[in-house]
């Protein structure tokens, strides 16, 4: 209710300034740190017990500034990042565009972040607070050895992470998506799976929606072979459906409502290709309870939101979690785990 009143003022700001405002507000607001505790929503993925399956996707809290405030809003987990070894400014501004008529966002941020030292200091300071925190890592744009960057980041962030995500699917770092190719992916996973050590947190992989069937099959096969913790499906798309907003032709990754059909189909593709052998995290165009329920029934053990928060506000996580509780009761299910892949 409150967000609907202040949304016009927030949306009058430049999108990047509005995002910064939201981070600063979360730092300052006296938020009630009550987490949704319906036991029927608890789900175990890669050995981690998630209190509910609704999380914040990477990209919102790039520098690990407000993970605990987000958990206090009712999210079951928060994925911070993407974080790179060295600080980088990202691409020139403007680089973030709000497509209000399409309930979408286009970004070409380019892994802008304060770097590993800053993130590590913040994550170390809050480590005793608990909660499920994923850390999404990337490579510096000018790196001579991107696989080494990923291995370094996984090793450095492992002590503070519930899980680690190798983000090789951003369209805004030239050549990054080439790491999804079969040979490169095998080398990457060999490096990052070894980096955290035998007792380290599980490693997830975030993939693009813009994949051919052969790519899906190859990624699924390698992920199973390497014992990946989960696949996050999917990142933003470079494709452009029929959009109505003024900034529809800006370059970058498209997220929000127009991504939903593609992200849902790609999730189903990976569910089929993996045969349920690896947990899936559904992300892309999830804005409602029905969206989350559909993604879970299509095979997602967890779901993540980000762009929808631009339009629905910070209460979205708690709203979806409560709605999923109702869905379980309506379908006579005792646990959200019963709903996974039940379509």
Curated annotation (Swiss-Prot):
PROSITE patterns with a match to the protein in the record: DHODEHASE_1 (PS00911), DHODEHASE_2 (PS00912)
Cell location: Cell membrane
Record EC number: 1.3.5.2
UniProt keyword annotation of GTP-binding present: no
Catalytic-site annotation from UniProt: 170 (nucleophile)
Record-listed FMN binding positions: 58-62, 82, 136, 167, 206, 234, 256, 285, 306-307
Amino-acid positions noted as binding substrate in the UniProt annotation, renumbered to this chain: 62, 107-111, 167, 172, 235-236
Pathway the protein contributes to: Pyrimidine metabolism; UMP biosynthesis via de novo pathway; orotate from (S)-dihydroorotate (quinone route): step 1/1
One Gene Ontology term, aspect cellular component: plasma membrane
Coiled coil: none
Keyword presence, Cytoplasm: no
GO terms of biological process kind: 'de novo' pyrimidine nucleobase biosynthetic process; 'de novo' UMP biosynthetic process
Catalytic activity field: (S)-dihydroorotate + a quinone = orotate + a quinol
Swiss-Prot/TrEMBL keywords: Cell membrane, Flavoprotein, FMN, Membrane, Oxidoreductase, Pyrimidine biosynthesis
Membrane-topology descriptor: Peripheral membrane protein
One Pfam entry name: DHO_dh
Entry similarity comment: Belongs to the dihydroorotate dehydrogenase family. Type 2 subfamily.
Protein role: Catalyzes the conversion of dihydroorotate to orotate with quinone as electron acceptor.
NCBIfam families the UniProt entry points to: PRK05286.1-2, PRK05286.2-5, pyrD_sub2
Name used for this protein in its record: Dihydroorotate dehydrogenase (quinone)
Source species: Erythrobacter litoralis (strain HTCC2594)
Lineage, top ranks: Bacteria, Pseudomonadati, Pseudomonadota, Alphaproteobacteria, Sphingomonadales
Gene giving rise to this polypeptide: pyrD
